[in-house]
């Protein structure tokens, strides 16, 4: 009896994909083959595919059975709980044991015989999937027991906190107003309310505080400097300039000028005591000027009224002689009239 559902093959027969051919059709194929009918004729007569007929007849000739499936059944299961237990025991005693050594030991101890002993690949799979997880769990438990208690996680907020063993220094530094307090075990001592400065981020402030606390000399803290104002400094004396005595400044500002070849001036000369500069004589551009060497005046216009070119200071020669010498030099010069030119 053909099933009421399925697919139709190329010969018009109905079959169900994935299911074996019914036993009645299998038996009929074998009977027709024994009668001497060719497989191609059996396929057309029973409307079964040629491949299915050939396969059923080949299996019947080899095994004498028309039943589908594996002949003799599947291999019995060898990885029993007893075998797994012995494998775990071997692995715990010798963690570096190999799979083939476990297989030989199973045979030597009589746990398995040569027919049901697991293969090397099966033992490796058992070590990896079943025993490996248990061993890792045991190692993790033992490691967890030897580990110290974990430290609390670092809080993350707008105030950067760092793990620091300096708890004593943290107790000394007060918390600025308006800033939430941070636990001393995980926070560094903070003295500045700013949380975005380079020293706070790098932790330099706590190091400087530690050095200042450990040093024998007193170093002012930031709080002490912030409490100081300009009113705390003493006022300068009226006779002092920028906190310094005027006498000391006057002594420093008075200095002696280095000698430069000219005699030093001991006193200042008022403008009223100086004579005006002499007016030069007007000389025609068409006249030749010649004078004796004694007529030149080796002096300066800024010389004193009572001085001469020969002796600029403290000279006894009257000033009128210098002008007389210049007048004589002008008279002794050879002049040419404009009419001669």
Curated annotation (Swiss-Prot):
Pfam families noted in UniProt: PAX (PF00292)
Q: Where is this region: Interaction with KDM5B?
A: 168-189
Please state the gene responsible for encoding this protein.
PAX9
One Gene Ontology MF term: DNA-binding transcription factor activity, RNA polymerase II-specific
PROSITE patterns found in the cross-reference section: PAIRED_1, PAIRED_2
Q: Per UniProt, which keywords does this protein have? A: Developmental protein, DNA-binding, Nucleus, Paired box, Transcription, Transcription regulation
| SUPFAM superfamilies tied to this protein | Homeodomain-like (SSF46689)
Which residue ranges are recorded for the region named PAI subdomain? 7-63
Q: Per the record, which residues fall in region RED subdomain?
A: 82-130
DNA-binding region, as residue ranges, is located at: 4-130
Superkingdom of origin organism: Eukaryota
Protein's recorded name: Paired box protein Pax-9
